[in-house]
Amino acid sequence: MIRNFVAKFTLLSLLALLFVACNDAVTYSEMKEKERNAVNRFIKENGIKVISFADFVANDSVTDVAKNEFVEIDGVYMQIVNNPADAADALKLKDGESRTFLVRYNEYNIQEGDTISTNIYMGEPDEMRVTNNSGTFSATFTSGVMMALYSTSYVPSGWLTPFGFLYFTRSTSNLAKVNLIVPHTKGTSNASTYVYPCLYSITFQPERSYVYDED
């Protein structure tokens, strides 16, 4: 299933490359402006309330889902849909730790209005290895759709924005979940090349050993 998905994606990427080659009169500045307009339009059309980082912190790092709040952090708009901080087994990724997370996601091109990829209906989730180095997070994919689709282990840096604020649990009914509006500068290699923003809906589940590790 992943192989067929990747083949289709590769064809679409080649068509996109052909389009860019035929439309090379468009400048990078114009592409960025088009991206900004797409994000602003998406925010307006979906009734998203953007709050400041200061308000986010003052509210205990909570975004009110009922009010459709997103907080902007370094160009990424983040909505924390569920943060299982009160779960009995809730843990954060501590300084110096590296852990594997199981990830379910949906990737939506805001500019074109199309779903690019998803593993929601796949048999296995994607896996990503995340490291906390003094509050700076880095990650690599170790398996899954994203790794196969983009032929790289690189995790979009925008995906790491929530890690400083989230708690994690293995309970499938209480997984950490976020919605992210990610600009091309913090997105996939394709997003960076063709300059488009994406909406990601992502759940994170730590690998089993994470819950039982000793301090």
What is the predicted role of each segment?
Residues 1-22:
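Sec-dependent bacterial lipoprotein signal peptides
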Residues 2, 22-215:
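Cross-family detector of peptidyl-prolyl cis-trans isomerase
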